[in-house]
């Protein structure tokens, strides 16, 4: 079994943990590869371009926070990912630093559970070529630096859903419901729910609210504006600047992200501890 390791190279503690992991793997004669940037930061030779790691590795290890896990998931495709939290929030990363070796041992023994997470798949035609992007959390279209408020036109299965003026629109999976969508007023959705949520960003109408839809729906969005360029972001990474009238199609991806589960974690407890969900405020505490 070969491990593909992706590290948040901007965190000293993540790099230190990666160095410790190398020693642990070598002592057990286990094969591993780092992505090129991580390998350079750690000064190790066992490396591969991250785009090729999926063909060489059986299991991925993400050392960082939720952002590192999201980044890793774009290249792991359907391979299992062990998420180790070396960040601040750690909402998606299943294991703490102290639990890392135990999690790897379970994978080696085959005694682990997988949490399948739905992805979004976005398509857009660019110069007669169809571009494809995926997102574990969300696909977001924003007004960017456009000085006026554009109109976002939305269709579901070729039927008009709405057209409203706003600063942007978020299409999120159940996994991504606790990310940008939540900050924009969207609902918390349990991860295994087969739904998406469409959340407006600062809409210009009080009647516009987030809407939860079945994840078998096909969503089409375009920006109605006389000019301008509008950022298309997938999991926080800008993929393209959309022109007015360019249609972005979003649907459920056939490829699931497979996260190695920490069976000691409970989603309700995570909401309380990570998001302080429903906690009573007690002055002085």
Swiss-Prot record:
Catalytic machinery residues: 66
Annotated SUPFAM superfamilies: NAD kinase/diacylglycerol kinase-like
Catalytic activity: NAD(+) + ATP = ADP + NADP(+) + H(+)
Class of this enzyme: transferase
Family of this protein: Belongs to the NAD kinase family.
Task performed by this protein: Involved in the regulation of the intracellular balance of NAD and NADP, and is a key enzyme in the biosynthesis of NADP. Catalyzes specifically the phosphorylation on 2'-hydroxyl of the adenosine moiety of NAD to yield NADP.
Name recorded for this polypeptide: NAD kinase
Organism listed in the record: Chlorobium phaeobacteroides (strain BS1)
Gene this protein is translated from: nadK
